[in-house]
From Swiss-Prot:
GN (gene name): dfa
UniProt source species: Dendrobium findlayanum (Findlay's orchid)
Lineage: Eukaryota, Viridiplantae, Streptophyta, Embryophyta, Tracheophyta
Major localization class: secreted
InterPro entries per record: Bulb-type_lectin_dom (IPR001480), Bulb-type_lectin_dom_sf (IPR036426)
Keyword Secreted: yes
Keyword Glycoprotein: no
Biological process per Gene Ontology, one example term: positive regulation of erythrocyte aggregation
Miscellaneous comment as given in the Swiss-Prot or TrEMBL entry: Mannose-binding activity stable when incubated at 85 degrees Celsius for 10 minutes, and increases 3 to 4 fold when incubated at 85 degrees Celsius for 10 minutes in the presence of 0.14 M 2-mercaptoethanol. Mannose-binding activity decreases to 27% when incubated at 85 degrees Celsius for 10 minutes in the presence of 0.35 M iodoacetate. Antifungal and hemagglutinating activity stable when incubated at 100 degrees Celsius for 5 minutes. Antifungal and hemagglutinating activity increase when incubated at 100 degrees Celsius for 5 minutes in the presence of 0.14 M 2-mercaptoethanol.
Record's function text: Mannose-specific lectin. Shows agglutinating activity towards chicken erythrocytes. Has antifungal activity against A.alternata and Collectotrichum species.
Stored CDD domains: B_lectin
Gene Ontology MF annotations: D-mannose binding
Name this polypeptide is given: Mannose-specific lectin
One cellular component (GO) term of this entry: extracellular region
Amino acid sequence: MAFSISSTMIFLLSLALFSTLVSADNHLLPGERLNPGNFLKQDRYMLIMQEDCNLVLYNLNKPEWATKTANQGSRCFVTLQSDGNFVIYDEHEQEGRNEAIWASKTDGENGNYVIILQKDGNLVLYSKPIFATGTNRFGSTAVVVAKRNRKAHFGVEQNIIEVTTNL
């Protein structure tokens, strides 16, 4: 009995650690979302979906960029759609629908997209650069070509990111 309790505790602790690491990623792939309190993190930069429905990019504790959507909903999340649009939705669970309250307006063809919080603090939507917060420090102009079950390398030297995708 002691063995199964210990095994269960180790398993639960592993799950807790894994879920913590997942919420500290620096990127979102299509279909992934940040719920209230979830964030992307890269060094001293953090993009957080706040409880008040405002999506804010912080440099340490100083806000650098925001969607200015505070109090425009009650249960918001942000997601990267398969068409390349980065959208904040207010979730109306009882009505079975979501209402868009902000979008990057980068929708196009379905494809391979990734949104990355770079090492320089710039939040960039890649397939080719089509949306950025304008907070870049090193002038990156990378292009991503993500393929099924492959690694993608992108970013200028100061911002090199490697993401393994299962698109």
